[in-house]
Amino acid sequence: MSGGNDSVLHRPVEAPLMEDGELSAVFTIRNSSGIHVRPAGTIVKLFEGEECEATLTYLGKTVNARSVMSILMLGASYNGEVAVHIKGPSASRVMQKLSEVFNSGFGEL
């Protein structure tokens, strides 16, 4: 293990895929405590005022990315990969924000 300093932090899925305002990407969880309440709240807050639908998928389970409780139910842990799918006019802006928070380890690195 490299202690969370991996050179590949954000791996787009097929580009990122852009079709009618749709984007998909895969992010690696870099903070050692995984996605707990604070990171889940950070993710949900990114969607405030944005026009898009979004899901997170971890270990085959897909949830609404606008719900803290749903995100917590994923149990996403350190070094896990979370697939993000966003659809809507704000998809590009929100994906950029998500990339920043995942790559910063939700401010816990």
From Swiss-Prot:
Keywords: Cytoplasm, Phosphotransferase system, Sugar transport, Transport. It holds the Pfam family PTS-HPr. It comes from the Bacteria. It is found in: Cytoplasm. GO terms for cellular component: cytoplasm. Its main location: cytoplasm. CDD domains: PTS-HPr_like. InterPro entries: HPr, HPr-like, HPr-like_sf, PTS_HPr_Ser_P_site. Belongs to the HPr family. General (non sugar-specific) component of the phosphoenolpyruvate-dependent sugar phosphotransferase system (sugar PTS). This major carbohydrate active-transport system catalyzes the phosphorylation of incoming sugar substrates concomitantly with their translocation across the cell membrane. The phosphoryl group from phosphoenolpyruvate (PEP) is transferred to the phosphoryl carrier protein HPr by enzyme I. Phospho-HPr then transfers it to the PTS EIIA domain. This is Phosphocarrier protein HPr. It comes from Chlamydia trachomatis serovar D (strain ATCC VR-885 / DSM 19411 / UW-3/Cx). The lineage of its organism: Bacteria, Pseudomonadati, Chlamydiota, Chlamydiia, Chlamydiales. The gene is ptsH.
